Amino acid sequence: MDSNLIFDQKVINGFAPVLTYAACEWFLILLMFIDALLSYLLVWFARYCRLQMPCFLCSKLLHPLHWRFLLCRNHRSEVSSYMSCQNHGNNLADCRGMCDDCLLSFTKMTGPNPDMNRLLLGKLGYDLLSRSHFAHPRSCSCCNKPWRTRHHTQRLIRLGSRGRNSSSKPNIPAPRHLTRRGSGGSLKKMRDHIATSGSEYVDVGSRDGMAHVGYTELKIHSDSESEFLFSDDDAFLHITDFNVEPSEKRTHKSRRRKSFDDKKMSNHKQPVLQDNQYKKIHVEDNETVESSMLGYNLENRTRQKQPVKAKEHDDVLSELITMSEARPFLLGSPRKYAAGVVTQNENEAEVSGSSSPSGGEFLSPSAENGASREIRIQEHDDSSDFSQNITSSAMEIEEFEAAIEQKESDHMDVSGSVANEPSSDEENEVEGDSKPLISNNMSDSLEQEQSGEEESEVNENNVAEEYFSNEEEDEVNGHTEPLTSKSESGSFAEEQSSEDEDGSNIYSVAKDHSSNEEDVDNEESEPMTSNNVTGVVKEEHSAKEEHGDHEETEPLTSLNISKEEPSLEHSDKDSLKITETRNTSNGSPELKHSASVESFVSISSDIEGESLVEVLKQQLEHGRKSLRDLNKEFEEERNASAIATNQAMAMITRLQEEKAALHMEALQYLRMMDEQAEHDMDALERANDVLADREKEIQDLEMELEYYRVKYPDEPREEILASMGILGNTEETNVTSPTDETSIKDSTDTKLTGSPSAEN
């Protein structure tokens, strides 16, 4: 009993608050209905009076308070989807149905910003990764302009690029002319810049998983990159072309540079000259041979352009050796005696030195036509090999001199004298008169020996003549008129030294050293041998024959020497043709050694001034050709990669379009199926409704029939049917037979029971 009371009390206590809450809720609904009516009247009155519509928030007294909480959940999402269009007078419309122009109307004030557009779409509830936003064209919710909704990522790209056609594309600089120095780097920097700018823009869409947005941006950048024009010839537009100068000017120019470099290097490399390197030639009588003295002075000037330091490079010896001295090693098998004869004619052979590229001297008369030059052989890097070569050559020279002295002892009769053209400059230089004797027998023996050597050396010398023939013509044409006196050669040395920075100092030192060596040689002078006389006579005779137009030399006075000239002329020409200038090699005071070690190398480098330039030009052309080939290959690869990229992008785009078309078609079929299903469902529902109505009618008729059976149990069936309206024509027929009654009864039963089934 107590438990029942407790239960009833709990029910009463729980039911009372519910009733109270329901009553309050109904009262609130009543007040809201009244407020709605008042608001409607307020709006209707303002519209009727053509007044400004009141704001539903401003009209609330709770506006200063938390009015945001007055909006329900559904209306919050609805209100948040509305947006003001600045293009149409701040018209408020649903932004989900706006066109692009109305949606981005706020960018007129703030400027376009893809990040802001993405954020806007995200805040508006767009599913950026959704693929099911394809629909038919519809009108804008603001301006009623028809527009077609696209995929939101594509719309994002359009929204980001609208109003900034120039800024949306990567900043591709104009194609500049590429130089050799910047060919690899400028194009690479430009590509890196494009890739960087493109990646920064793509990352905007790829940070939130928008891979397809980034891909579309990549497509845009690849298109713009393919539009970048680049020609194969652009990389070579500003490459400095080498000036092609004549062979003479180019040779002299390069040689002057070498001369300047030699002078600059003279302070660093100053080899010790051998004491017996140069030998002065004296005749027995009071006169000196002009060509011998001229060669001696020119050699001294050539040597003294590089000051000598006696204590530097003590283990290295330098020696100027003519090609005729190297003949036993170069040309095969001449006699040692002939080589020894030429060894002591070193100064006479050097008289014919041409204006070498480094020394800046002119050709003597005998040198221009006889192609007498000296080759400066560069020393090997290996000092041991160089010292061995010098030692061997020195031993050979000593043996030759011993043989010559032995020959001199056999011929004691000396006759004849050599007369030379007197020169005022040479008379001032020559200190003391030396009078060596010349033997007639010695001259005859030399004539026989030289004639015997001539036959064996002609074939060998022809080989060297072929090498130097072309160079001799260029050198002879390129040089100025030779000098015939020491004063002229000295003036040329002064002119040449004035062109360089340190020319005057070097020339003065060379002049002093030359005078000192003249004193020393005058003190140590020996009688002139027949070999030296032969060289002097040959030089004078060749100078007379070949260069009579430029200068004249005084005829010889000795009959014996004049007899020797025909036999010695050809051999001396050959020896002078083989002789090469050693001033054409690199480096100013380079140490020289015998030409026998590298004879064919020296022959091939006789035109080193031009051959070096040609080799460098060939290397340069080869480098240009290889660079051009590499650029062509690079361009082909780049074009092939660009074409492949474009094809891949086009294929992917085509696949995307096909996929989108298939997706739209599938959506259309699905929508059609849904509509058909809805139509079928409606038809089925209508059929069910009709069936239910028929069944209800049948039930009503059955109930009515039972009612009449109960009410009129004794009444005949005809009356019942007549009263129901089934037999309305019974009075017309007046058929009362039992057979008719039975048929009527059967027909009635059939109508009552068969009509529903027929409809079913």
Swiss-Prot record:
Main localisation: membrane
KO phenotype (gene knockout): No visible phenotype. Myob1, myob2, myob3 and myob4 quadruple mutant has a significant height reduction, a reduced rosette diameter and a delayed flowering.
UniProt biased composition (Polar residues): 385-394, 730-741, 750-760
Acidic residues composition bias: residue spans: 446-458, 517-526
Biased composition annotated in UniProt, kind: Low complexity: 352-366
Pfam families linked to this entry: Zein-binding (PF04576)
GO molecular function: myosin XI tail binding
UniProt feature coiled coil, ranges: 388-416
Domain of life the protein comes from: Eukaryota
Annotated function: Membrane-anchored myosin receptors that define a distinct, plant-specific transport vesicle compartment.
Name of the protein described by the UniProt record: Probable myosin-binding protein 4
